[in-house]
């Protein structure tokens, strides 16, 4: 087995709080067909994101990433913080 290092790339991301009035949401997450909410107004609110691999679920505190080719997907906070740093 070989080892690999992730290439340094710059992505856009934000931490999703699940708050209905979150002002940090970038315009790209609100493009029709990218994402939709379930259980709005409840503690169980989730953000469903249409990805190349199918619909993925983001929960409160997850990071939402837009990759280098415009793909959007959720990432758990521990993985995000171990993989990315501010630029």
Task: Report residues per predicted region.
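Short, compact, well-ordered microdomains
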Residues: 53-87
């Amino acid at each position: 087995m070989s080892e690999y290092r992730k290439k340094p790339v710059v992505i856009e991301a934000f931490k999703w709080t699940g708050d209905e009035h979150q002002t940090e949401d970038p315009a790209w997450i609100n493009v029709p067909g990218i994402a939709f909410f379930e259980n709005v107004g409840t503690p169980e609110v989730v953000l469903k994101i249409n990805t190349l691999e199918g619909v993925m679920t983001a929960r409160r505190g997850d990071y939402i990433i837009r990759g280098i080719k415009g793909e959007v997907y959720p990432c758990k906070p521990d993985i995000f913080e171990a993989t990315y740093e501010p630029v």
